[in-house]
Amino acid sequence: MAVFDDVRDVVVEQLSVDPEAVKMESKIIEDLGADSLDVVELVMALEEKFEVEIPDTEAEKLISIADVVNYIEKLGK
């Protein structure tokens, strides 16, 4: 769950949400209250944290925390 922990840390910092609110099934917009600008900033922070590039076409598919974790794990980070 190391990737989840790192993703949670980034989400908590970027969205100013309680760490307990960030679960694998949490939806970034619906559950965590992010708007479109928050999502862009979150993707940029994730790219920096994991040293990856997330194309816009892929970022649009990242709806939940699980989507983010699975995508980053798929990249081998």
UniProtKB/Swiss-Prot annotation:
<comment type="pathway">
    <text>Lipid metabolism; fatty acid biosynthesis.</text>
</comment>
<keyword id="KW-0596">Phosphopantetheine</keyword>
<dbReference type="Pfam" id="PF00550">
    <property type="entry name" value="PP-binding"/>
</dbReference>
<dbReference type="InterPro" id="IPR009081">
    <property type="entry name" value="PP-bd_ACP"/>
</dbReference>
<feature type="modified residue" description="O-(pantetheine 4'-phosphoryl)serine">
    <location>
        <position position="36"/>
    </location>
</feature>
<keyword id="KW-0597">Phosphoprotein</keyword>
<comment type="similarity">
    <text>Belongs to the acyl carrier protein (ACP) family.</text>
</comment>
<dbReference type="GO" id="GO:0000036">
    <property type="term" value="F:acyl carrier activity"/>
</dbReference>
<dbReference type="GO" id="GO:0016020">
    <property type="term" value="C:membrane"/>
</dbReference>
<keyword id="KW-0275">Fatty acid biosynthesis</keyword>
<dbReference type="GO" id="GO:0009245">
    <property type="term" value="P:lipid A biosynthetic process"/>
</dbReference>
<dbReference type="InterPro" id="IPR003231">
    <property type="entry name" value="ACP"/>
</dbReference>
<dbReference type="GO" id="GO:0000035">
    <property type="term" value="F:acyl binding"/>
</dbReference>
<dbReference type="GO" id="GO:0005829">
    <property type="term" value="C:cytosol"/>
</dbReference>
<keyword id="KW-0444">Lipid biosynthesis</keyword>
<comment type="function">
    <text>Carrier of the growing fatty acid chain in fatty acid biosynthesis.</text>
</comment>
<dbReference type="InterPro" id="IPR036736">
    <property type="entry name" value="ACP-like_sf"/>
</dbReference>
<feature type="domain" description="Carrier">
    <location>
        <begin position="1"/>
        <end position="76"/>
    </location>
</feature>
<dbReference type="InterPro" id="IPR006162">
    <property type="entry name" value="Ppantetheine_attach_site"/>
</dbReference>
<keyword id="KW-0963">Cytoplasm</keyword>
<keyword id="KW-0443">Lipid metabolism</keyword>
<keyword id="KW-0276">Fatty acid metabolism</keyword>
<protein>
    <recommendedName>
        <fullName>Acyl carrier protein</fullName>
    </recommendedName>
</protein>
